[in-house]
Amino acid sequence: MTTTLPANPPPFGGSPDLAGRVRRRFATGRAEVSPAAVVEAVRETGGPVLGDRDVLRLAARVHDDLVGAGPLGPLLADPEVTDVLVNATEVWVDRGDGLRREPLSMASPDAARRLAQRLVAATGRRLDDGAPYADAILPDGTRLHAVLPPVATGGPYLSLRTFRRHPFTLVDLVARNTVPPPVADLLAAVVAARLAFLVVGGTGSGKTTLLNTLIELVPRDERIVLVEDAAELRPAHPHVVGLQCKTSNVEGAGAVEMTDLVRQALRMRPDRLIVGECRGAEIVDLLRALNTGHEGGAGTLHANAIADVPARLEALGLLGGLPRVALHAQAAAALQVVLQMRRTSTGRVLSTVGLVAAEGPDRLVTVRPAWDRATGVAAAGADLARLLATRGARVPELLWGAER
């Protein structure tokens, strides 16, 4: 019979000594740390008589401490939690409305260090005094970054970005007030018209969430190829293939970079090419791809406002050896729409929809607001409506007035 432990067990009120004895039984590493083995160890370890429910609760806690995320396990299992941060013993959590200090804390900085080292080691990577920081992807998709002292001056520090098992749909984002209902129709029209777009914003603003949601709107008969530094996008779409970067081995060889992956993706017959985060020379390959028949592509970019996007593209283009004038020419032809995400005190919101245009004698790229959360439809709304109509897409009601 298969033993299943509670995924998010309630607090166990039994003896901490009993839990410690059970942990020590597995400390040698010779015994398999399976749910059934932990339950058996709880029953065999001398102590107070426990009912089945308490046995399962204690076993779940011990199992999580040995192979899971320890005291952070319940937080990572909470579907509302997006980020869990550990500063030595302090635990901070973001549930979509900003960081909040949790009543929970790590037992000691050493306990935080041991947890970080165990989680990183389970992914085949190293975290110790000789390699004091590491990135890892946990088996459930959670992204982990850990830094040890003395590099972490008050650490250790752990940063965990959770993986949402049931991604948000566009309906969900409307219900959460991330996207107003009329703008949801506009976003659907952008995808249907195969307009290439960038989702921009600061760290933790919801860029990946919105991109994942919009990918799900791609017609089911199209093939989507994802290129990411670390796999985060999990769209509910029947034909998605993904590529992710690979770090070098201990000899410093074997790394696979984003630029390599974009070029490989172009050989995989993509109907839509999606670059999870443009932060280097791969922007050059993406723009070239979008200009050679791969319409409807998308990506994310760190930028605090739509007006900052051209300068950000310039900086990334230089990393790929693309001169300023050539970068602007490529971007003007390849990109049509920019979506600005922002994190507020009440949650993450879509703040602006911008239209990419080339202006002036040098034909430099600008991004003009077509819709703004504070002011509504803006000057470029009419141009966006005409572009959608030209592409054969239904112009959403939001832009009806602007179209005339």
Please describe what each predicted stretch is:
Residues M1-L127:
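N-terminal accessory targeting/assembly segments
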Residues D78, W92-A193:
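P-loop NTP-binding catalytic core
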Residues R164-A175, N212, E216-R263, V309-L313:
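P-loop NTPase switch/communication element
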Residues V190, G202-T203:
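P-loop (Walker A) phosphate-binding loop of NTP-binding proteins
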Residues V199:
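Hydrophobic anchor at the beta1->P-loop junction of P-loop NTPases
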Residues K207:
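Conserved lysine of the Walker
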Residues E228, P235, A265-Q340, S345, ...:
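Conserved P-loop NTPase nucleotide-binding/switch module
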Residues G347-R404:
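NTP-binding/hydrolysis catalytic cores, primarily Walker-type P-loop NTPases
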